[in-house]
Amino acid sequence: VVGNTKTNDNVIYRELRIKPGELYSKDKVVRTIREVGQLGFFDAEQISPDFKNVDPNQGTVDIELGLVESGASQIELQGGYGGGGFIGTVGLAFNNFSTKNIKNRKAWRPLPMGDGQTFAIRLQTSTFYSTRSFSFVEPWFGGRQPVQFSLSLSSTKQYRYDYFTRRADKSQSFEIAGFNVGLAKRLRVPDDYFVLSQSISYQYYNLQNYFTGLFTFGNGESHNIAYNIALSRNNTFTNPIFPVGGSNFTLSARLSPPYSLIRGDDYADIAERPEYQDNSGNPIQAEIDQARYRWLEFYKIKFDGSWYTRLFGKFVLKAQTDFGFLGTYNSNLGNIPFERFYLGGDGMQQYAMDGRETIALRGYENGSLSSRDGSIIYNKFSLELRYPISLKPTASVFALSFLEAGNGFDDFKDYSPFDIKRSAGIGVRVFMPAFGLLGIDFGYGFD
């Protein structure tokens, strides 16, 4: 292996499918190129095996794998002025980090790199809102097996903002804090493209005099503990930014404990209990919902599948389908107001205080294909025709045209997979190592 000026040899060697002393296999050479390209540390278009000292009589050959390092770190600096005053963002993501060399002064050029770890921090603040997040990923936990360890921490606090006085009222606040810790293991059966991921996550929601209509209660707290499991298979090749073949799918489940079953309380008569009624005997909905949602009880099933096919020349067709369902173990509790799906728009508005998932469907306004309270079930289909303009390590650029269709529903009994809203449009994507993936789309919704 030559050309790896930053990445350590062992990070590359553990991805190789060709081993010294084995019989030559074209399939293993192709797989090696694919796996090294998927690391994201090298220019996938310039990974070139060089065959040397070919000896047909002895049945031996030397293979030299030529690599070109590409930037793996990203910097995010943003500043702006909006209706809520100044908003500043600082983010750093190091995608080829080395924790073992932190104490080695010589390794700080400018940072200790080369072990394939991911380390990211992000801070955002404004007059009434602040958030902090940290994440770390070790792709080979322990260094011997392809078991990925991940850890993330986050904290968000928002105050009620008065747009007339331009002041934040710190007596009215909403706070979220949480963590996620997980392991992901590369499987051998059915094949070694499969990965099984498992994690435990926890979010703490705390409302203090925060009556905004987002929830039916403005004082109280909620706890969201969930076990997350996902089975995925990714055999796309060769460039992770612009795949030209293969598929990538993920089937996942997010499960909370069945608290009502554990406690032996199904909440069927909660509105009739005196502690949840006013002096006139009328139920107090805010206190009822605070009791129902103190410990969030739900399950969530999702599927995401993408297929890439080279059509002719450099044109590549991407076909994708998405599905999500939020359910409840106890019908008396109903579906939680958190974790819901909001379909429509660019899908970029990830900031949300209620743990919602924004699902892009270009050609429509953000969230316009879901109700105000969010959908509990959705499906989406899309086709993209892509053409690469440049796939250089400094910047990868490709143009695309798309057809999309999807819809969100408030109840499973209303779900109809072909009752969908359609759109079409064009766009362009630009990937620069220092800034990540940038893009712009122009879409039109037909329905």
Which residues does each PLM region occupy?
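C-terminal outer-membrane beta-barrel translocator/porin domains of Gram-negative envelope proteins
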Residues: P56-N57, S73-G82, G213-I389, S401-F402, ...
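N-terminal periplasmic "start-of-domain" segments of outer-membrane beta-barrel proteins
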Residues: K6-P20
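C-terminal soluble interaction/assembly domains
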Residues: I18-L23, F418
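Extracytoplasmic/secreted envelope proteins and their assembly/folding machinery
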Residues: D9, Y13, K26-I33, K302
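Gram-negative/organellar outer-membrane beta-barrel architecture
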Residues: E22-F242, S247-N248, R362, G374, ...
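C-terminal beta-signal and terminal closure region of outer-membrane beta-barrel proteins
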Residues: G345-M348, M353, K413-D447
